[in-house]
C-alpha cells in the first residue's frame, strides 16, 4: 500500500520514517516534505502545499490508500472533511473538531461546559476591560492570542507591565494578525508540564507514550516561547496514577463532550497539561495533531506498526489493539537557526549529517531543503537529534553526540534537554 503524509516538519519526517517501516507499505509520499523525507528509504516528496486541499485530495485519490495529517493548519481548514466527502481514508479531526486547537476561546468554553479541569480564565476583544481584569488578578498571569500562532501566541507575564504590553500588542496592535483579535487571559498554573497524546476513533482512546517538551528558547527555561526546543519520552511526572487521572478527568470527558456537541473526534489528540504537586492535571491547551518535537522521541520508542494503529482507528476499533513501546527513555534535541524564534537566515549549508548518521540515533529533518545537491536550512527549527538510552542521561548524552557532529552558520541548541527527568534519576527532585 501507499501512504500520504501531509506536512514538512520534524513531526512529518518522524511519521514518514515510522510508516515506511511497515513491510506492507511500498511508498510513503510526503507533501511537501523536506530534505530528510526526500532521502528517507521508501519516501518521496510531492510538491503540494499543506493548504492546497483540492490538489492533495486529487493526488491521494490517484496514488495512495491512506493519508495521515501532520500539521494543524490543513485540519482547521477542513482537509479531513474534503477527503471524507470524496471517500478517501484520512486520519485526523474534521474542521469542527479541530476547533479544539483552532480557537483557544472555544476550548476554554468547552472545558468549562464539561467541567474539565483548566486554569480560571476570561476572553476579551477590547483593551480596556482586559486591562481592568489584569489589575484585578495581578501577576504572574498568562495571555494567549485566540487563534493559531504556530505555538508562539502565548505570553507568560511575570509582572503587570509585561501583561499590559502583551494585551495592547495582541488587541490594539494585532501582533499575530487575525489570531490576536481576541485574547484569553488565564491564571498562571504552578507545577510540571507534560504532553499527553492519544489516538481517538470517535469513541475509543489509545494512549501514546507520554512526553515532555521544552518550550523556552534558552537553557533553564529562559527566554521567549518557541514551537519546542526538544522533548523526551516518557515523562516521569506522569505516574501510573496520574496517567489514569488524565484519562478519566481530561481525555474521556473531552472525547464524549465533542461527540455530544456534534463534533465526533477522530485523529491524534494532544493535551498539554500542568500536573500539580498532588498529581492533579489541568489542561493548558489542546492540539488536534501530534506534537513537534514530541513525535520524534515517541516514534523512536513505538514498536508497533503506526499504520495498523491508524487503520484500527479508522475502523473504530482502537479498543481491539494495543501499542507496544521500547521501555527505554528517548531524548530529542532541536537544532535551530540563529535568531529563532525571531528573524533568522535561511539557505545556510548544513554540514556533518553523514557523520551524525554513522552514530546510534536518528536525526530528523524539519526546516531543511535540498539545493544543488546540498542540504540547506529553510526554517527556524532545522533538525531534531534523537537518541534512545538505558537512562534519560544516557539518551541525552547520545542525542548531544549527534548534535555536536552537525554544523552550519548560526546553528544553536539548548544544552539541558531532559534536565527535570535527569534530576529525578539522580534523586535531586
From Swiss-Prot:
Pfam families registered for this protein in UniProt:
GARS_A, GARS_C, GARS_N
EC number of this enzyme: 6.3.4.13
PROSITE patterns attached to this UniProt entry: ATP_GRASP, GARS
Spell out the reaction equation it catalyses: 5-phospho-beta-D-ribosylamine + glycine + ATP = N(1)-(5-phospho-beta-D-ribosyl)glycinamide + ADP + phosphate + H(+)
Task: Indicate whether Ligase appears among the record's keywords.
Answer: yes
Q: Which residues take part in binding Mg(2+)?
A: 285, 287
Q: Which SMART domains match?
A: GARS_A, GARS_C
Keywords linked to the UniProt accession: ATP-binding, Ligase, Magnesium, Manganese, Metal-binding, Nucleotide-binding, Purine biosynthesis
Q: How is the cofactor bound?
A: Binds 1 Mg(2+) or Mn(2+) ion per subunit.
What GO MF annotations does this protein's record show? ATP binding; metal ion binding; phosphoribosylamine-glycine ligase activity
The protein's name in its UniProt record: Phosphoribosylamine--glycine ligase
Originating species: Pseudomonas aeruginosa (strain ATCC 15692 / DSM 22644 / CIP 104116 / JCM 14847 / LMG 12228 / 1C / PRS 101 / PAO1)
Gene encoding this polypeptide? purD
Amino acid at each position: 500500500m501507499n501512504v500520504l503524509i501531509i506536512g514538512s516538519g520534524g513531526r512529518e519526517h518522524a511519521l514518514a520514517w515510522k510508516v515506511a517501516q511497515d513491510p506492507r507499505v511500498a511508498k510513503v509520499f510526503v507533501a511537501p516534505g523536506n530534505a530528510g523525507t526526500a532521502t528517507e528509504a521508501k519516501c518521496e516528496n510531492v510538491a503540494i502545499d499543506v493548504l492546497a486541499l483540492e490538489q492533495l485530495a486529487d493526488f491521494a485519490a490517484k496514488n495512495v490508500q491512506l493519508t495521515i495529517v501532520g500539521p494543524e493548519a490543513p485540519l482547521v481548514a477542513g482537509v479531513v472533511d474534503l477527503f471524507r466527502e470524496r471517500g478517501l481514508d484520512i486520519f485526523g479531526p474534521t474542521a469542527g473538531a479541530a476547533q479544539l486547537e483552532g480557537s483557544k476561546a472555544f476550548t476554554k468554553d468547552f472545558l468549562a461546559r464539561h467541567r474539565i479541569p483548566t486554569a480560571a480564565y476570561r476572553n476579551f476583544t477590547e483593551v480596556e476591560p482586559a486591562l481592568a481584569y489584569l489589575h484585578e488578578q495581578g501577576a504572574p498571569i498568562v495571555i494567549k492570542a485566540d487563534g493559531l500562532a504556530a505555538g508562539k501566541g502565548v505570553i507568560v507575564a511575570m509582572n503587570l507591565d509585561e501583561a499590559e504590553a502583551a494585551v495592547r500588542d495582541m488587541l490594539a496592535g494585532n501582533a499575530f494578525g487575525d489570531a490576536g483579535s481576541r485574547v484569553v487571559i488565564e491564571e498562571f498554573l504552578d507545577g510540571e508540564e507534560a504532553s499527553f497524546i492519544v489516538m481517538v476513533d470517535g469513541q475509543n482512546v489509545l494512549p501514546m507514550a507520554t512526553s515532555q517538551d521544552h518550550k523556552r528558547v534558552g537553557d533553564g527555561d529562559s527566554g521567549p516561547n518557541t514551537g519546542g526546543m526538544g522533548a523526551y519520552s516518557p515523562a516521569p511526572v506522569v505516574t501510573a496514577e496520574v496517567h489514569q487521572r488524565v484519562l478519566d478527568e481530561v481525555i474521556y470527558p473531552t472525547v464524549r463532550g465533542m461527540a455530544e456537541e456534534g463534533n465526533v473526534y477522530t485523529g491524534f489528540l494532544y493535551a498539554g497539561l500542568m500536573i500539580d504537586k498532588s498529581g492533579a492535571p489541568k489542561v493548558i491547551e489542546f492540539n488536534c495533531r501530534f506534537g513537534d518535537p514530541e513525535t520524534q522521541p515517541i516514534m523512536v520508542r513505538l514498536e508497533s506498526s503506526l499504520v495498523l494503529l491508524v487503520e484500527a482507528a479508522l475502523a473504530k476499533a482502537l479498543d481491539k489493539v494495543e501499542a507496544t513501546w521500547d521501555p527505554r527513555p528517548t531524548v530529542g534535541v532541536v537544532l535551530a537557526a540563529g535568531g529563532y524564534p525571531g528573524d533568522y537566515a535561511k539557505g545556510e549549508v548544513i554540514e556533518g549529517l553523514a557523520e551524525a548518521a554513522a552514530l546510534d540515533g536518528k536525526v530528523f529533518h524539519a526546516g531543511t531543503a535540498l539545493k544543488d545537491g546540498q542540504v540547506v536550512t529553510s526554517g527556524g527549527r532545522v533538525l531534531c537529534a534523537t537518541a534512545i538510552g538505558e537512562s534519560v542521561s544516557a539518551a541525552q548524552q547520545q542525542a548531544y553526540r549527534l548534535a555536536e557532529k552537525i554544523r552550519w552558520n548560526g546553528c544553536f541548541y539548548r544544552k539541558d534537554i531532559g534536565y527535570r527527568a535527569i534530576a529525578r534519576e539522580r534523586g535531586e527532585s
